[in-house]
Structure formats: C-alpha cells, structure tokens
Amino acid sequence: MTDYFEVHARDGAARIGELRLSDSVTTPAVVDDVLADAGSLWAAERELPDGSDDVLTVLPHRSLPAGSADEVRESFSVAYPDVDFPSAAVVTADTADDFGADAYVLSDAQGFVGHARAFRDNVIEAKENLPADTALVLSGVATPRNVSLLVYAGVDLVDEKLARARGLEGFYLTSDGEYFLEDLDELPCACEACRKPASEFTRADAADHNANALRAELARVRRRVRDGRLRDYVEGQARHDQWLTALFRRFDQQYSFMEQRVPVIRDSELTAASEESIDRVEIQRFADRVTKRYRNRFDNPLVLLPCSAKKPYSESQSHRQFQEAVQYRAHMVSMTSPIGVVPQELELTYPAQHYDSVVTGDWSEDEKSFVAEVLRRYLERNDYPRIIAHLPPGAYTDIVERVADDLDLDVEFTVSEHPTTTESIGNLMRTLDGEPKFTREEREHNVVKALADYQLGPDAGDALFSDVALEMTSRYPKLQVWNDAGVQLATMVPQYGVLSFTLEGAKVWRDSDAPTKTVEIDGFVPHGSVLAPGVVDADEDIRPGDEVVVEGPKAFAIGRAEMGGRELVESTRGIGVEIRHVEER
C-alpha cells in the first residue's frame, strides 16, 4: 500500500503522478533534492532511519549488479520493514515485489540502459511485479535526450547524476544530442548557466546546464503526457540515438504491456507521421476490433472509398459527393493509411476521426501491406453481394487487387483518373443502378449496434438490442437510443464515437450475453466517482476510458474507467471510475 504516491493522469505506460511530500513533487521528475539514501548494507549494518515527510527515504539496501546469479540475489536479499514515512526500496527486475514502499529503485539500471532488449525486458518485468500505484525510479541513467523514452516506458523518477557527470567530463547535452565543449562556438541554450560567452563556459557550467536541460525536458514530457501526445513526441526523439530507436521499436513489439495502459478514447489528435505510427496501440487496436468485433449488417453492396484529409470523412467535400452518388444504396467503407479500413458506422470512433497523417500520395510497402492485411481480414469476416472500388489508381487499387486475388473476389472499379471527376461519379451512380436503398432508420440502428460490437465484443450489438424495439431521437451523430417503453438506454457520444449507457441501458447490458466489464465496489453509494480504495475487484480486460458497470452491496452504477483493470484492483489512491448514473440498492 502506498500513502505517498498517487497517479493523476496516464498516457500509455507514462504517468503524471504526485510524490506526496511536505512540498509535493509532480512526476515524472528529477528527485535529487528530495531523495535521502539511508545507505548500503554492504558497507555496514544500518539503523532504520527516522524518516521525514520532507524527503523520499531509500531504506537500507544491498544493490546487486546486472546479471547477478539467482542464488546470490536470494542470499543477500533485504527484508524491508513497514515504515510510516515516504520510502523507497531497492530492487532488481528479478526481485521486484510489493515491499510496502511508495517507490522502487532498480539497482541494475545502469547495466541495461543502452541495450534495448535488456532495458525493455527489465522494465516490463519490474512493472508487472511491482504494485501498479508505486513509482519506478532509475538512477544514474537520465539525459535530456533519453528521458522522454524512459518516461514512455514507465519510469517516474530519475536523477541528475549522469547529466552532471557528462558535463564535468566536458560534454554539453541537449534534447537531441551532445557536444564537446571545445566544439561549441556559441551556446544553443538560454538557461541561467548558459548566460555567458562560450569562451568563459566551464565544465562546472556544463554540469549545471545539463541538469537544467534535463529538468526542462521533463517539463516538456509532462505537458505531452497531460495532452495524451507523448507518443507523437517520442517518435521523433527516438531518431536521435540508435539505442533509443531500438528501444522504441522493442516496446512496440510488447503490444500486451502497452495496450492495457493506453486509453480506448481520447479527444486529442493522433499524429501519424512515421513508419512506426502503424505500430501504435491505438491503430493496431482499431484494426483488430474492426476485423474481429465489428460485423456489417447491411445487405447492400460494398463501396470502398479513399480517405479524406477532413475528419470525419462524411463532412469532407469529396465524401459528400460520394454520398450523393451512393444514395443509401451501398455500405461505404473508407481505406486509409495508417488506420486500415473504416466502416461508415465507425467514422467517429477513436482514432478514426482524430488522426492526421502526412499526405504525399505515395505509400510505402509497409503501409500497403498493413492496409491490405486489414482489408483481407475484413472481407473474410464480412460478406457482400458485390464489391465496388471507387478508388484512385495507384496504391489504393494495388491493395484491392492484391486482396481480391488472395480471396478470389470479383471487384468492380469505377474511377477514371480521380474519384471526384464527373465521369467517375457518374460511373459510381450507374454501377449502383437498380440496387435497393436502405432507410435512414436502418442506418442509425446499424450504427448503434456497430458501436456496441466495437466497444464490448463480437455480436454485442445484437445481444443488447435484438430483443429491444429501438427508437432513435435526435439526428446522427447525436443519436439517443430508447426502447419502446420510452426508457432511454444509451447516447452516442460524437466526440469519441462510442455509446454512453444510462442506468437502464447498463442493466440491459448486464443481463445480456454481451461481455460485461464490471467493477465490484465495497458497501457504499458512490457520488461523482469511485476512488481506488473502494474497489473490491475488476475485470482484467478493462482499459482506461472503457464503459463499465459498477456493482456493490449498496449501489448499482454506470460510468467510465479511469484506470485499467489491474490498476483498479491494486491501487490504493486515485480515481478509479467516473460515475455517470447511480442508484441505491
């Protein structure tokens, strides 16, 4: 149980936290000024310190180097006492466990920083073994260049030791590199240490500058985490050092570790500006849900369309032309890099309306392969009487032809030169001649069911609403879902493209065959939010931002999770669920 560290915001594994000392420290941060080391037990026996609320006290410890044998670790393990002051325990990834501390220092960090695979494996093992609501500390490894990646991986606290040491060795550090002092004609910084001519700049000044640069970079990182856009930043930062590039890619390979920490909804823009953007959890998750959860419910032909720069697609000039040509006679699905395929019902769902990519007209082979794989999986799951490709010649048509050949499908192409030319629009209209129209009501019902599929699981839309006579009020995209008894079940949230349930809707969800995400609470009636100490249990597959049913002996509620399932159970501080509706039992 931690009393002195609390997480306030999350962006994947990165977190904004509070080290609750007399003067609180917002993390991620440098900890030099508030860290008190009680000493190593290798040198001598140590008395348990009195501790203080002013500092984070590292309890007496035995640090072991990276690669120490298991029997050595066991022989020299330390029994950490329970204390009533802010404390940190020293561990390795192998020995990491809940010792009742507020923070944990990885003693062998200097042995694996610089080695991407070892860093990834050690940090992930430590994060999986330590309590979710404690701080992770890495000492002697942080620089302005690498600290954003350290935070991205889940590190909360660092120190200035390496940055200052490099300065005393004659190196001037920046967020994108390092320079020999003698190579600097001018100082590319305006911090207090740099307010002198380069000719008068000493190694001691460099140490001060490096510490200032590290603190400034951490401030930038904290802002990015608050905005939910740290990933956008580290995609660029990783380019400044080969091991950081390797580390970045290694963490992308750990989908499970990252996915359980990445929110399912955000209102911030997702910038897809590099090849690695395809590997983002948000993009992989969307593609996975579209091809495993979503199911087309229209009986009409499929029309494949290009994406548009404007989001949502339906509000773009080109897609309005396509809609006028289609006239409710076909199911429209957009193809895009790096998202994959976007059925019209999910065009508002994060990240389909939130991403922005570099538009050059040229697709890399990786982009083509990814979109082709998503389209192939989509067409394997969804049957259509006809497939019409209203796509510009080039990458789009290459992808469709590749998939059509693999699946032995017939595809009708309708574009001459460009999708919005008069000739191309006319071709699309004529190709759909004689096809029956679906109604606006049918479209709206299918939107609601598709959102339920995407949010909750395969066929959830039918499980929730097949036995309910749905009535829609308001117009798309602000749909409200009512049953035939005049009781509201849910509302579509245009900002995120998800369903927000009422209490009655939550009961329908709970009693249906759709997978239910449930948070079990203690015997109280929550008002506004459920704090983590009140959580008794929670489904492991809950992600931050998920719609969740909250049940306890005295209350039934519906709300949105602020933490993942594991964190809900393990945390002793912080808001676990934001409650929307509640009733007493």
Swiss-Prot record:
Metabolic or biological pathway: tRNA modification; archaeosine-tRNA biosynthesis
UniProt enzyme class: transferase
Catalysed reactions, as listed in the record: 7-cyano-7-carbaguanosine(15) in tRNA + L-glutamine + H2O = archaeosine(15) in tRNA + L-glutamate
Domain PUA stretches: 516-584
GO biological process, one term: tRNA wobble guanine modification
GO molecular function, one term: RNA binding
Gene3D superfamilies for the chain: ArcTGT, C2 domain, PUA domain, Queuine tRNA-ribosyltransferase-like, Uracil-DNA glycosylase-like
Pfam families referenced in this protein's UniProt entry, alphabetically: DUF5591, PUA, TGT, TGT_C2
Keywords: Transferase, tRNA processing
SMART domains in UniProt: PUA (SM00359)
Entry GO terms, CC: cytoplasm
Origin superkingdom: Archaea
Transmembrane segments: none
Annotated family: Belongs to the archaeosine synthase type 1 family.
Subunit architecture: Homodimer.
Protein name (Swiss-Prot/TrEMBL): Archaeosine synthase
Species, as recorded: Haloferax volcanii (strain ATCC 29605 / DSM 3757 / JCM 8879 / NBRC 14742 / NCIMB 2012 / VKM B-1768 / DS2) (Halobacterium volcanii)
Gene from which this protein is expressed: arcS
